Structure formats: structure tokens, C-alpha cells
């Protein structure tokens, strides 16, 4: 059975583009024990906690930008899922899919606990072998199209990139990818100060977010290709409101 790709388009923050392609990076450093305790308090995983915090930040920002509730769009964050835990694979290539977590501001205001529960249950439903198998079947069916099979590769590359930019990334506000706890051989540890997981901004949205944990610190790397740090500021406020101590650094020029 194939899964449908039809989804509502998410709200996208806009701003002043950096003139020379400069990418702004804001890294927020959190204490692992505090983050784990906070996630446990809300009954979610660390990834789900950070996803819910980001969604609340986006929701607050959209409410400021779009006062009329009826005109607001869904707030959606894409969370990559490692398929190796669902399907046996020895490939060294990227073997992942995604789950789009969502709230609809037109339905009313959401508390943080409500967002946490929506994210938690969406991840539980989406991160399932049967659901992922249906998504994979959709992609495989496209590959078997007679038209696509005879199409020159350079045409496929152009068409796929255009389709991804038009109907792929636009379905979510941003991607929040958690690399998890970084593991290295013990002999390497004395020479490593920290790990940062930085992913580039999207084609049709100015933000993205990567997370990695090293030692007792969670590093949340927020990138943007616009000048205004509005989302990062609201994300920081949400984390601070949860009682988390946040240290912030930036490459702002």
C-alpha cells in the first residue's frame, strides 16, 4: 500500500536575506541532566521535547505576525527517523525517513503540554514499520514509472530538485534533526572538546536545526539565511520558561 504525499503547506517565516549567502549560526547549549529531567516530567523523549519547544516558538511568532487566527497556517516540524531500527540494513548510506509533527493554530491556543502530547503520539504513529513501508512503497512506485525510467539522468536531477523544493520542504516550517549521543572510541575522547551538528537552511524556508549531545551538554545548532534572529529568540524563551539553563553563542558579524 502506498502512502499519500498530500499535506497542508506549513507557515514559513520570512525576513531580510543575507546579501552574500552568509549563514547565521546560533548554538544553544543545555545541560543533559536538566533536559532529561524536563523530558521525563512531560512524558516525552529529548527529541520530542525540543521539537515541542520549537513548535511553540514558531506558534508564538506566527501569532505575532498574523493576528487573525483564521489566516494562520499549520506549524509543522520535520523530524528525521533512522530506519535501521525498523528494517535490517547494513548500508553505509543515509537510510532515513521522516515524520512531520503538526499543530493547527486555527483550532485554538496550545499549551506546551498539549504540544508535547501531540508530538509524542505523532512520532509514535509515524515511526512505525508499516507506516514507513507505505512511504517507501510510494517512492519505489515513482522509480518504476516507464516515463522516468527512460528519462535522461540530468533531466531527472533537475525535475527532482524542483519538485522537492516545491512540494517537499514547503510542507514543514523547518527540520529538527537529533544526532543523539555521539559515541567515539575511548582513545579519542581526550582530544575532543565538543561536537556540533549543523545542517544548512532549506531552499524555501530560512531556518533549520541540528542537535547533538557530547558529554554533559546538548548542543542545539540553529541556522538561518536571513538577518532577523526572531525564531531563535523565541525558542530561547521557551527553553528558559521550562527551567532550563541555556548558554548561547553565535557567529553574528
Model-based region annotation:
Residues 46-55:
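Short amphipathic alpha-helical segments
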Residues 25-30, 36, 60-253:
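Acyl-thioester-dependent acyl-group transfer interface
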Residues 1-44:
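Flexible, P/S/T/G-rich "lid" or insertion loops adjacent to the active sites of thioester-utilizing
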